[in-house]
């Protein structure tokens, strides 16, 4: 693009310089030394060159429009001739004006070439943006819709997973609650059994104490009975000894008596002896039977007390074993209960954390969706702004195209005003101008873009241009 712009710039500048040099040679001829007769030729050609340069650019035509010949009246040139110094000064002024106009024309051509290059660059950007916009129109809404639908499906799937996980956790929680209630009920039953066992143990201890007291009392009774039996045995033995002594003494006496007494007395003594022996044997047998009965009763009572004591000890040991087993079971149930409660708290905390994470994820996805919507809205605003810029650029391009066509039409018009000019050899005599001020209407068009809408305002301005009297008097 820069090469084409530079080529167009060089072509237009070369064309204008060739036209200007050709019109200069046609009007003024080759640059020989000036003569007094060439003054009228140069002075008359100033108006034609002013017309030619007035068609070169809007600025030069606006600036040099005041030098056009007035509609009413014409300058009358006297027959006097100017001297060589005046022709020299006019020629220098004309050359300076021509050089300034050529420089301004060159600058305007450069600016115009830059504008053309900028317009081409903006047209390329506009075409690229149109392609991107068409691609974005064709793809991005569907893609954004697909992304939104996919994210919504993922969110729904995550919500379903969360719902199922929540239901599962609730079922587990209900099961754990039921297990906990059963364990609590079992713990209460075991606690009640333990209390009953402890109460029975207290009663058994009381019974054991009573049995111990009874046993001690019975042992004391047994000891007293044994002492009594021993005393009775001793008494019986003493009685037996006394009886034996008495019997022996009686036998001795009987022998002595038998020797002296009659046989009737011996028989009587023998009867008495037999009676006493029967009484002694009967007393001994009764004492032995009483002793045996008492001993049997005491043995039976001791055996009964011993059996009751043994049963009480056995029941006490069994109660102790039951209490120990129940205590161990209660401790185990307490540990299980604490573990279940801890697991329940951990599950609740984990569920709360997961729910918070899912809520944060849902909020993040909603925020991303909102950002995507904002970005889409921003892209649409940028696209609208680009459309506005494109519209403004199209308007500017059309304006520059019209200006360029007008300039080219002005340049291509053949110069006929040079032949109609009469070459005078006299110094012009100034007459009062009928219209010293020329009026010019200027159309000002302003193009603005407000809120995506193009606003075009036009205004007309009346411009007054005074003739340069010093320039006119210089003729």
Curated annotation (Swiss-Prot):
Keyword list, A-Z: Cell projection, Coiled coil, Cytoplasm, Cytoskeleton, Intermediate filament, Nitration, Phosphoprotein
Annotated spans, Linker 2: 244-266
GO CC annotations, alphabetized: axon; C-fiber; intermediate filament; neurofilament; neuronal cell body; perikaryon; photoreceptor outer segment; photoreceptor outer segment membrane
Sequence segments annotated as region (Coil 1B): 148-243
Post-translational events: Phosphorylated; phosphorylation increases after nerve injury in regenerating neurons.
Region annotation Coil 1A: where it falls in the sequence: 104-136
Modified residue annotations for Phosphotyrosine: 475
UniProt note on tissues of expression: Expressed in the sciatic nerve and at very low levels in the central nervous system (at protein level). Expressed in the spinal cord, in the sciatic nerve at the level of the dorsal root ganglion and in trigeminal nerves (at protein level). Expressed in the cranial nerves in the hindbrain, including the sensory and motor trigeminal neurons, the mesencephalic trigeminal neurons, the spinal trigeminal neurons, and in the facial nerve (at protein level). Expressed in the cerebellum, with expression in the inferior cerebellar peduncle and the lateral deep cerebellar nucleus (at protein level).
Segments of this protein annotated with the region Disordered: 1-42, 453-475
UniProt KW Coiled coil keyword: yes
Effect of residue 66 to A: Abolishes phosphorylation by AKT
Subcellular location: Cytoplasm, Cytoskeleton; Cell projection, Axon; Perikaryon
Biased composition (Low complexity): 14-26
Gene3D superfamilies: 1.20.5.170, Single helix bin, Vasodilator-stimulated phosphoprotein
Family, per entry: Belongs to the intermediate filament family.
The protein's name in its UniProt record: Peripherin
């Amino acid at each position: 693009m820069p090469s084409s712009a530079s080529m167009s710039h060089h072509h237009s500048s070369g064309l204008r310089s060739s036209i200007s040099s050709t019109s200069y040679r046609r009007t003024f001829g080759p640059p020989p030394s000036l003569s007094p007769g060439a003054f009228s030729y140069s002075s008359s050609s100033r108006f034609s060159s002013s017309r030619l340069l007035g068609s070169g650019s809007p600025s030069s035509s606006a600036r040099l429009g005041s030098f056009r010949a007035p509609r009413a009246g014409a300058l009358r040139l006297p027959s006097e001739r100017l001297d060589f110094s005046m022709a020299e000064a006019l020629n220098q002024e004309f050359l300076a004006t021509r050089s300034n106009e050529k420089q301004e024309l060159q600058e305007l051509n450069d600016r115009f070439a830059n504008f053309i290059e900028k317009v081409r660059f903006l047209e390329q950007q506009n075409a690229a943006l149109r392609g991107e916009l068409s691609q974005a129109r064709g793809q991005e809404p569907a893609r954004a819709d697909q992304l939104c639908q996919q994210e919504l499906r993922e969110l729904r799937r995550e919500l379903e997973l969360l719902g199922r996980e929540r239901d599962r956790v609730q079922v587990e929680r209900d099961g754990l609650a039921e297990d906990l209630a059963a364990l609590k009920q079992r713990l209460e039953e075991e606690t009640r059994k333990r209390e009953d066992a402890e109460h029975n143990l207290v009663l058994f201890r009381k019974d054991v104490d009573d049995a111990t007291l009874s046993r001690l009392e019975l042992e004391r009774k047994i000891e007293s009975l044994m002492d009594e039996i021993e005393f009775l045995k001793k008494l019986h033995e003493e009685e037996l000894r006394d009886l034996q002594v008495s019997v022996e003494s009686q036998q001795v006496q009987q022998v002595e008596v038998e020797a002296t007494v009659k046989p009737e007395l011996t028989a009587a003594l023998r009867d008495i002896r037999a009676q006493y022996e029967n009484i002694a044997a009967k007393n001994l047998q009764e004492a032995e039977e009483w002793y045996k009965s008492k001993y049997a009763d005491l043995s039976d009572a001791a055996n009964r007390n011993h059996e009751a004591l043994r049963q009480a000890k056995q029941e006490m040991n069994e109660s102790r074993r039951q209490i120990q087993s129940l205590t161990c079971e209660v401790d185990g149930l307490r540990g299980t209960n604490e573990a279940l409660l801890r697991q329940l708290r951990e599950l609740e905390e984990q569920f709360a954390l997961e729910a918070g994470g899912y809520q944060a994820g849902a909020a993040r996805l909603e925020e991303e969706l909102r950002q995507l919507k904002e970005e889409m809205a921003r892209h649409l605003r940028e696209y609208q702004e680009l459309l506005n810029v494109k519209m403004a650029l199209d308007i500017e391009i059309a304006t520059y195209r019209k200006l360029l066509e007008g300039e080219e039409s002005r340049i291509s018009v053949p110069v006929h005003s040079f032949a109609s000019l009469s070459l005078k050899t006299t110094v012009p005599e100034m007459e009062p101008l009928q219209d010293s001020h020329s009026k010019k209407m200027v159309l000002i068009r302003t193009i603005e873009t407000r809120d995506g809408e193009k606003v075009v305002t036009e205004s007309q301005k009346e411009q007054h241009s005074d003739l340069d009297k010093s320039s006119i008097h210089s003729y």
